[in-house]
Amino acid sequence: MESAKRVLVYLTKENSLLQCAKFAQGITGHYSANNGDKAFIHCGLEKNQFVISDCQFLGSARVQLQRPSFCPIKNLSPRQSASLPQEIQGRGVDVGVAVLVQSINKKVLLTRRSKSLNIFPNVWVPPGGHVELGEQLLEAGLRELQEETGLRLQEVSWSMLGLWESAFPPLLSRGLPSRHHIVTYLLVQTNETHQQMQERLCPDEREVSACVWLDTEIAKHIVAAEDSGSPCGPLPASISVLELIHGSLSQSDRSMATFLNSAPKEGEDIERISTGTKYALSLWLDGMPTNSSPCA
C-alpha cells in the first residue's frame, strides 16, 4: 500500500487508542472547542507515526494547530465526503515539514514554487516537503532545504513554530480535496547573514522559480494584511527577489501587492504567499523581541 511508504498522522484524545487520521477528518476541529479553527495540542514523531494528542507524552512539543476558516476538509458535506474516490478516502493525512530559515540579521527565506508543480504552483512558501520513513523532523526539513535551494546548513538551532492543516485544492469552489496534510513549521536559526547564504543558493528549477529574503518589517505588513485586510502603515512599492532564469539567479523587483494577495475564492490561483506561510510568519514575529515598530 502507498500509505505504508508515507509518514501519516495519528490521533489520540482523552487517552483513547491511537488511530490513523482519516482523509476527510478535520484534525483541528477534533481538538478545538465547537469545531473551531485553532487548538493547542501536543505532537511528536514516534516510530514513523506523527502523533497528535491533547495530552503531553514523552518527547512531545506543545504548539498551536490552526486551519483557515475556508478549509475544504472542514467544509465538506457528508455527501461530498462520501463522493470522494476510494483511493483518496484511504490516503490518510500526510505529514509535511517546512523550514523557516532565519539568518543572524533576522531575515527569513521563502521560495516560489515552480509553475509546473501540481500542488500550489507559483505560490510562495518556505522550503519543505514530505517526511520520509526513518527521518526526524529537522532531518527531513534540512534535506528538503538542500534539495530545493542547494543550501546545506551545518550548525543550527531550531524549534517547532506550529502546525497548519492544509488541503489542496485550497477551496471547495475549485474542486474536492485530493491532498490533506498537517504541515509542521520549523524555525531554523543560523549564525550566517542572509548574504552569506544567498551566495550558496542553487535552486532546483523543477521545484523553485524564485527566492526572497523577508525582514521583520515586511513580514509584519504581510501578516497585518491577512488579519485585517490592510497592511499596517506605509509600504514599499516593491521587494527585491531572486528569479531563477535559465538556471541562474537574477535580481529583480516584485510588486509588494503580490505578497499581500490572498487565495481567490473562485477561478485560477494567483501568485501569493500561502495562507499557511502567513500563519508561520505570524508565529515567527510573535517570538521576536518587542520593538517600537508601528506594526507592533
Swiss-Prot record:
Gene label: nudt17
Signal peptide (residue range): none
Catalytic reaction list: a 5'-end (N(7)-methyl 5'-triphosphoguanosine)-ribonucleoside in mRNA + H2O = N(7)-methyl-GDP + a 5'-end phospho-ribonucleoside in mRNA + 2 H(+)
Family classification: Belongs to the Nudix hydrolase family.
Role summary: Acts as a decapping enzyme capable of hydrolyzing monomethylated capped RNAs (in vitro). Hydrolyzes monomethylated capped RNA after alpha and beta phosphates to form N(7)-methyl-GDP. Shows low activity towards unmethylated capped RNA.
Record PANTHER family: NUCLEOSIDE DIPHOSPHATE-LINKED MOIETY X MOTIF 17 (PTHR42904:SF1), NUDIX HYDROLASE, NUDC SUBFAMILY (PTHR42904)
Cofactor(s) needed by this chain: Mg(2+); Mn(2+)
Protein name per UniProt: m7GpppN-mRNA hydrolase NUDT17
Domain Nudix hydrolase: 90-236
SUPFAM superfamilies with a match to the protein in the record: Nudix (SSF55811)
Keywords: Hydrolase, Magnesium, Manganese, Metal-binding
PROSITE patterns on file: NUDIX
Record flagged with keyword Chloroplast: no
Binding site for Mg(2+): E144, E148
Motif (Nudix box): 129-150
GO molecular function, one term: NADH pyrophosphatase activity
GO biological process entries: NAD catabolic process; NADH metabolic process; NADP catabolic process
GO cellular component labels: cytosol; peroxisome
A Pfam cross-reference name: NUDIX
Enzyme Commission number: 3.6.1.62
